[in-house]
Protein backbone atom coordinates (compact mmCIF):
# COMPACT_ATOMS: atom_id res chain seq x y z
CA UNK A 1 0.00 0.00 0.00
CA UNK A 2 1.07 3.59 -0.66
CA UNK A 3 0.74 6.51 1.71
CA UNK A 4 -0.53 9.99 0.86
CA UNK A 5 2.95 11.46 1.24
CA UNK A 6 4.49 8.83 -1.05
CA UNK A 7 1.96 9.42 -3.81
CA UNK A 8 2.32 13.18 -3.42
CA UNK A 9 6.10 12.92 -3.71
CA UNK A 10 5.84 10.69 -6.77
CA UNK A 11 3.60 13.32 -8.37
CA UNK A 12 6.04 16.10 -7.50
CA UNK A 13 8.99 14.33 -9.13
CA UNK A 14 6.85 13.48 -12.16
CA UNK A 15 6.00 17.16 -12.72
CA UNK A 16 8.61 19.46 -11.16
CA UNK A 17 12.09 19.45 -12.69
CA UNK A 18 15.03 21.38 -11.26
CA UNK A 19 16.54 21.32 -14.74
CA UNK A 20 14.18 24.07 -15.90
CA UNK A 21 14.95 26.56 -13.11
CA UNK A 22 18.00 28.34 -14.63
CA UNK A 23 16.18 29.11 -17.89
CA UNK A 24 13.31 30.73 -15.96
CA UNK A 25 15.73 32.58 -13.67
CA UNK A 26 16.69 34.77 -16.64
CA UNK A 27 13.29 36.48 -16.27
CA UNK A 28 13.95 37.50 -12.67
CA UNK A 29 10.87 38.59 -10.72
CA UNK A 30 8.76 38.15 -13.87
CA UNK A 31 9.24 34.40 -13.50
CA UNK A 32 6.69 34.51 -10.66
CA UNK A 33 3.94 35.54 -13.08
CA UNK A 34 5.23 33.16 -15.74
CA UNK A 35 4.82 30.32 -13.25
CA UNK A 36 1.52 31.45 -11.74
CA UNK A 37 -0.45 32.01 -14.97
CA UNK A 38 0.02 28.41 -16.19
CA UNK A 39 -0.57 27.20 -12.63
CA UNK A 40 -3.95 28.94 -12.47
CA UNK A 41 -5.12 27.97 -15.96
CA UNK A 42 -3.62 24.47 -16.12
CA UNK A 43 -1.92 23.02 -13.02
CA UNK A 44 -4.70 23.66 -10.51
CA UNK A 45 -7.58 22.70 -12.87
CA UNK A 46 -5.73 19.54 -13.90
CA UNK A 47 -5.13 18.66 -10.27
CA UNK A 48 -8.82 19.17 -9.41
CA UNK A 49 -9.99 17.12 -12.40
CA UNK A 50 -7.54 14.31 -11.63
CA UNK A 51 -8.66 14.24 -8.00
CA UNK A 52 -12.34 14.16 -8.98
CA UNK A 53 -12.03 11.50 -11.69
CA UNK A 54 -9.74 9.26 -9.65
CA UNK A 55 -12.28 9.05 -6.84
CA UNK A 56 -14.97 7.82 -9.24
CA UNK A 57 -13.08 5.81 -11.85
CA UNK A 58 -9.90 4.00 -10.89
CA UNK A 59 -7.35 3.39 -13.63
CA UNK A 60 -6.16 6.78 -14.82
CA UNK A 61 -6.32 8.37 -18.26
CA UNK A 62 -7.33 5.26 -20.19
CA UNK A 63 -10.34 4.52 -17.98
CA UNK A 64 -11.46 8.15 -17.84
CA UNK A 65 -11.40 8.63 -21.60
CA UNK A 66 -12.86 5.17 -22.24
CA UNK A 67 -15.86 5.92 -20.04
CA UNK A 68 -16.57 9.08 -22.03
CA UNK A 69 -15.64 8.14 -25.60
CA UNK A 70 -15.20 4.38 -25.79
CA UNK A 71 -12.38 1.86 -25.84
CA UNK A 72 -10.53 2.96 -28.96
CA UNK A 73 -10.33 6.64 -28.02
CA UNK A 74 -9.32 5.61 -24.52
CA UNK A 75 -6.53 3.52 -26.00
CA UNK A 76 -5.43 6.44 -28.18
CA UNK A 77 -5.23 8.70 -25.11
CA UNK A 78 -3.06 6.33 -23.08
CA UNK A 79 -0.95 5.47 -26.13
CA UNK A 80 -0.13 9.15 -26.69
CA UNK A 81 0.76 9.59 -23.02
CA UNK A 82 2.96 6.51 -23.13
CA UNK A 83 4.82 7.10 -26.39
CA UNK A 84 5.72 10.72 -25.65
CA UNK A 85 7.37 9.52 -22.46
CA UNK A 86 9.31 6.77 -24.20
CA UNK A 87 11.18 9.36 -26.25
CA UNK A 88 11.55 11.63 -23.19
CA UNK A 89 13.38 9.09 -21.03
CA UNK A 90 16.75 9.44 -22.82
CA UNK A 91 16.53 13.24 -22.47
CA UNK A 92 15.89 13.10 -18.73
CA UNK A 93 18.57 10.50 -18.10
CA UNK A 94 21.03 12.55 -20.19
CA UNK A 95 20.46 15.30 -17.60
CA UNK A 96 21.31 12.75 -14.90
CA UNK A 97 24.49 11.88 -16.79
CA UNK A 98 25.51 15.54 -16.80
CA UNK A 99 24.84 15.85 -13.05
CA UNK A 100 26.91 12.74 -12.37
CA UNK A 101 29.80 14.20 -14.34
CA UNK A 102 29.95 17.00 -11.74
CA UNK A 103 30.05 14.37 -9.01
CA UNK A 104 33.24 13.06 -10.59
CA UNK A 105 34.60 16.59 -10.99
CA UNK A 106 34.52 16.22 -14.78
CA UNK A 107 31.75 18.54 -15.98
CA UNK A 108 32.90 18.25 -19.60
CA UNK A 109 32.16 14.53 -19.54
CA UNK A 110 28.52 15.38 -20.17
CA UNK A 111 29.47 16.19 -23.78
CA UNK A 112 30.81 12.68 -24.38
CA UNK A 113 28.21 10.73 -26.35
CA UNK A 114 29.49 7.29 -25.33
CA UNK A 115 29.38 8.21 -21.63
CA UNK A 116 25.88 9.68 -21.89
CA UNK A 117 24.55 6.67 -23.83
CA UNK A 118 26.04 4.26 -21.28
CA UNK A 119 24.45 6.14 -18.37
CA UNK A 120 21.08 6.24 -20.15
CA UNK A 121 21.07 2.49 -20.74
CA UNK A 122 22.28 1.52 -17.25
CA UNK A 123 19.97 3.86 -15.33
CA UNK A 124 16.94 3.17 -17.48
CA UNK A 125 17.21 -0.56 -16.93
CA UNK A 126 17.82 0.06 -13.22
CA UNK A 127 14.58 2.07 -13.15
CA UNK A 128 12.81 -0.73 -14.96
CA UNK A 129 14.05 -3.29 -12.44
CA UNK A 130 12.68 -1.12 -9.62
CA UNK A 131 9.31 -0.85 -11.37
CA UNK A 132 9.20 -4.61 -11.99
CA UNK A 133 9.47 -5.29 -8.25
CA UNK A 134 6.03 -3.80 -7.66
CA UNK A 135 4.33 -1.01 -5.75
CA UNK A 136 6.08 -1.07 -2.38
CA UNK A 137 9.66 -0.82 -3.66
CA UNK A 138 8.64 1.57 -6.44
CA UNK A 139 6.87 3.89 -3.98
CA UNK A 140 9.74 3.86 -1.49
CA UNK A 141 12.49 4.43 -4.04
CA UNK A 142 10.55 7.12 -5.92
CA UNK A 143 9.39 9.06 -2.85
CA UNK A 144 12.67 8.91 -0.89
CA UNK A 145 14.75 9.78 -3.96
CA UNK A 146 12.40 12.66 -4.72
CA UNK A 147 12.58 13.93 -1.15
CA UNK A 148 16.36 14.12 -0.99
CA UNK A 149 16.96 14.77 -4.68
CA UNK A 150 14.27 17.34 -5.49
CA UNK A 151 12.81 18.87 -2.33
CA UNK A 152 16.09 19.17 -0.42
CA UNK A 153 18.03 20.89 -3.26
CA UNK A 154 15.07 23.23 -3.82
CA UNK A 155 14.97 24.16 -0.13
CA UNK A 156 18.74 24.64 -0.13
CA UNK A 157 18.45 27.09 -3.03
CA UNK A 158 15.80 29.01 -1.10
CA UNK A 159 18.09 29.21 1.95
CA UNK A 160 21.01 30.36 -0.22
CA UNK A 161 18.81 33.03 -1.81
CA UNK A 162 17.66 34.36 1.56
CA UNK A 163 21.24 34.48 2.88
CA UNK A 164 22.38 36.22 -0.32
CA UNK A 165 19.85 38.99 0.20
CA UNK A 166 20.37 39.19 3.97
CA UNK A 167 24.12 39.80 3.76
CA UNK A 168 23.71 42.43 1.06
CA UNK A 169 25.38 40.66 -1.84
CA UNK A 170 24.88 42.16 -5.33
CA UNK A 171 21.61 41.07 -6.92
CA UNK A 172 21.84 40.01 -10.56
CA UNK A 173 18.26 40.93 -11.45
CA UNK A 174 16.02 43.97 -11.01
CA UNK A 175 13.95 44.16 -7.82
CA UNK A 176 11.76 47.04 -8.99
CA UNK A 177 7.98 46.50 -9.07
CA UNK A 178 8.03 46.91 -12.86
CA UNK A 179 10.20 43.78 -13.09
CA UNK A 180 7.23 41.69 -11.96
CA UNK A 181 5.76 42.01 -15.46
CA UNK A 182 7.47 39.91 -18.13
CA UNK A 183 8.58 41.79 -21.25
CA UNK A 184 6.05 41.63 -24.08
CA UNK A 185 7.69 40.45 -27.29
CA UNK A 186 4.61 39.40 -29.22
CA UNK A 187 3.97 35.76 -30.02
CA UNK A 188 7.22 34.72 -28.30
CA UNK A 189 5.75 35.74 -24.93
CA UNK A 190 2.69 33.57 -25.52
CA UNK A 191 4.92 30.66 -26.52
CA UNK A 192 6.84 31.05 -23.25
CA UNK A 193 3.64 30.78 -21.20
CA UNK A 194 2.51 27.77 -23.23
CA UNK A 195 5.87 26.07 -22.66
CA UNK A 196 5.37 26.56 -18.93
CA UNK A 197 1.93 24.97 -19.25
CA UNK A 198 3.67 21.90 -20.67
CA UNK A 199 6.12 22.02 -17.75
CA UNK A 200 3.17 21.31 -15.44
CA UNK A 201 2.08 18.20 -17.34
CA UNK A 202 1.85 14.98 -15.37
CA UNK A 203 -0.56 15.62 -12.50
CA UNK A 204 -2.72 12.76 -13.77
CA UNK A 205 0.01 10.18 -14.36
CA UNK A 206 -0.10 8.63 -10.89
CA UNK A 207 -3.88 8.26 -10.85
CA UNK A 208 -3.27 4.64 -11.91
CA UNK A 209 -1.91 4.09 -8.39
CA UNK A 210 -5.03 5.38 -6.62
CA UNK A 211 -6.08 1.83 -5.78
CA UNK A 212 -2.80 1.37 -3.92
CA UNK A 213 -4.03 3.81 -1.27
CA UNK A 214 -5.96 2.47 1.70
CA UNK A 215 -8.84 4.93 1.17
CA UNK A 216 -8.53 6.22 -2.44
CA UNK A 217 -11.61 8.43 -2.31
CA UNK A 218 -10.27 10.50 0.57
CA UNK A 219 -6.52 10.12 0.20
CA UNK A 220 -5.97 10.73 -3.51
CA UNK A 221 -7.35 14.32 -3.43
CA UNK A 222 -5.13 14.99 -0.40
CA UNK A 223 -2.09 13.67 -2.24
CA UNK A 224 -2.87 15.86 -5.26
CA UNK A 225 -3.39 18.96 -3.09
CA UNK A 226 -0.09 18.38 -1.28
CA UNK A 227 1.72 17.75 -4.58
CA UNK A 228 0.36 20.98 -6.10
CA UNK A 229 1.67 23.07 -3.19
CA UNK A 230 5.07 21.37 -3.28
CA UNK A 231 5.41 21.77 -7.06
CA UNK A 232 4.92 25.53 -6.80
CA UNK A 233 7.39 25.66 -3.90
CA UNK A 234 10.01 23.70 -5.85
CA UNK A 235 9.69 25.88 -8.94
CA UNK A 236 9.04 29.49 -7.91
CA UNK A 237 11.28 30.31 -4.94
CA UNK A 238 14.41 28.42 -6.09
CA UNK A 239 14.15 30.16 -9.47
CA UNK A 240 14.23 33.53 -7.71
CA UNK A 241 17.24 32.44 -5.65
CA UNK A 242 19.16 31.65 -8.83
CA UNK A 243 18.06 34.93 -10.42
CA UNK A 244 19.33 36.90 -7.42
CA UNK A 245 22.83 35.43 -7.34
CA UNK A 246 23.85 33.93 -10.66
CA UNK A 247 24.39 35.86 -13.93
CA UNK A 248 22.42 34.10 -16.66
CA UNK A 249 25.41 34.01 -19.01
CA UNK A 250 27.08 31.57 -16.62
CA UNK A 251 24.30 29.00 -16.83
CA UNK A 252 24.34 26.23 -19.43
CA UNK A 253 21.22 24.81 -21.05
CA UNK A 254 21.71 21.30 -19.67
CA UNK A 255 24.02 21.76 -16.69
CA UNK A 256 22.61 25.12 -15.56
CA UNK A 257 21.31 23.88 -12.21
CA UNK A 258 24.69 22.32 -11.37
CA UNK A 259 26.49 25.54 -12.30
CA UNK A 260 24.05 27.55 -10.18
CA UNK A 261 24.82 25.46 -7.12
CA UNK A 262 28.55 25.66 -7.86
CA UNK A 263 28.26 29.45 -7.91
CA UNK A 264 26.66 29.45 -4.46
CA UNK A 265 29.01 26.86 -2.96
CA UNK A 266 32.16 28.51 -4.31
CA UNK A 267 31.03 31.91 -3.07
CA UNK A 268 30.45 30.62 0.45
CA UNK A 269 33.70 28.62 0.49
CA UNK A 270 31.94 25.26 0.29
CA UNK A 271 33.32 23.90 -2.97
CA UNK A 272 32.98 20.35 -1.65
CA UNK A 273 29.19 20.78 -1.81
CA UNK A 274 28.97 20.84 -5.62
CA UNK A 275 29.58 17.11 -6.22
CA UNK A 276 27.34 16.21 -3.28
CA UNK A 277 24.37 18.26 -4.48
CA UNK A 278 24.94 17.11 -8.07
CA UNK A 279 24.59 13.53 -6.86
CA UNK A 280 21.34 14.42 -5.07
CA UNK A 281 19.98 16.19 -8.17
CA UNK A 282 20.78 13.09 -10.23
CA UNK A 283 18.90 11.03 -7.65
CA UNK A 284 15.87 13.33 -7.91
CA UNK A 285 15.87 13.07 -11.69
CA UNK A 286 16.13 9.29 -11.36
CA UNK A 287 13.00 9.39 -9.18
CA UNK A 288 11.11 11.17 -11.98
CA UNK A 289 12.09 8.42 -14.43
CA UNK A 290 10.89 5.76 -11.98
CA UNK A 291 7.57 7.58 -11.55
CA UNK A 292 6.95 7.93 -15.29
CA UNK A 293 8.03 4.36 -16.09
CA UNK A 294 5.43 2.89 -13.76
CA UNK A 295 2.51 5.20 -14.61
CA UNK A 296 1.68 5.27 -18.35
CA UNK A 297 2.80 1.66 -18.85
CA UNK A 298 0.31 0.51 -16.22
CA UNK A 299 -2.43 2.47 -17.96
CA UNK A 300 -1.42 0.89 -21.26
CA UNK A 301 -1.76 -2.53 -19.64
CA UNK A 302 -5.37 -1.76 -18.75
CA UNK A 303 -6.02 -0.99 -22.42
CA UNK A 304 -4.10 -4.07 -23.58
CA UNK A 305 -6.24 -6.38 -21.45
CA UNK A 306 -9.35 -5.37 -23.39
CA UNK A 307 -7.87 -7.04 -26.48
CA UNK A 308 -6.58 -3.88 -28.15
CA UNK A 309 -2.99 -5.16 -27.98
CA UNK A 310 -1.37 -8.59 -28.54
CA UNK A 311 -1.41 -11.11 -25.65
CA UNK A 312 2.39 -10.88 -25.31
CA UNK A 313 2.05 -7.25 -24.21
CA UNK A 314 -0.52 -8.21 -21.57
CA UNK A 315 1.94 -10.36 -19.63
CA UNK A 316 2.41 -9.60 -15.92
CA UNK A 317 5.07 -10.93 -13.57
CA UNK A 318 4.74 -12.42 -10.08
CA UNK A 319 4.42 -8.91 -8.62
CA UNK A 320 1.47 -8.17 -10.94
CA UNK A 321 3.58 -5.64 -12.87
CA UNK A 322 3.22 -5.06 -16.63
CA UNK A 323 6.36 -6.97 -17.68
CA UNK A 324 5.09 -7.43 -21.24
CA UNK A 325 5.15 -3.65 -21.73
CA UNK A 326 8.15 -2.62 -19.62
CA UNK A 327 10.64 -4.92 -21.35
CA UNK A 328 9.82 -3.82 -24.95
CA UNK A 329 9.74 -0.25 -23.66
CA UNK A 330 13.28 -0.70 -22.33
CA UNK A 331 14.46 -2.08 -25.67
CA UNK A 332 13.07 0.98 -27.47
CA UNK A 333 14.83 3.35 -25.04
CA UNK A 334 18.09 1.41 -25.46
CA UNK A 335 17.90 1.81 -29.24
CA UNK A 336 17.18 5.54 -28.88
CA UNK A 337 20.18 5.92 -26.55
CA UNK A 338 22.46 4.33 -29.14
CA UNK A 339 21.38 6.60 -31.99
PLM regions and their residue ranges:
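Membrane-interface "cap" regions at the ends of multi-pass membrane proteins
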Residues: 1-51, 55, 174-179, 183
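TM-loop-TM module centered on a large, flexible mid-protein loop between adjacent transmembrane helices
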Residues: 62-65, 70, 102-107, 223-290, ...
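Transmembrane helix-loop junctions in multi-pass membrane proteins
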Residues: 17-25, 30, 130-136, 309, ...
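Hydrophobic transmembrane alpha-helices that form the core helical bundles
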Residues: 25-26, 44-124, 128-132, 282-302
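Hydrophobic alpha-helical transmembrane segments in multi-pass membrane proteins
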Residues: 10, 35, 39, 85, ...
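Transmembrane alpha-helical segments of multi-pass small-molecule transport proteins
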Residues: 5-11, 104-136, 150-158, 326-332
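Juxtamembrane helix-boundary/capping and inter-helix hinge elements in multi-pass membrane proteins
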Residues: 29-30, 56-59, 67-73, 211-219, ...
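Helix-loop-helix junctions that connect adjacent transmembrane segments
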Residues: 111-115, 144-278
Amino acid sequence: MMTVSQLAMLTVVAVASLRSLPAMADYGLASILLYLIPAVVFLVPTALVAAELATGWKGGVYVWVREAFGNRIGFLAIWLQWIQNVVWYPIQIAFIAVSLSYVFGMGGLGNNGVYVAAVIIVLYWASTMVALRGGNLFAKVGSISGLIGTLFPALLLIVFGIIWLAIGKPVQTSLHASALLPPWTGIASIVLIVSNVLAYAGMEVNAVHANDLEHPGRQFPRAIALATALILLVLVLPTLAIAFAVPHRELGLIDGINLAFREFFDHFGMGWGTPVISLLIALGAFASVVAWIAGPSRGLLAAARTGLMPPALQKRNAHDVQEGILIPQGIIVTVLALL
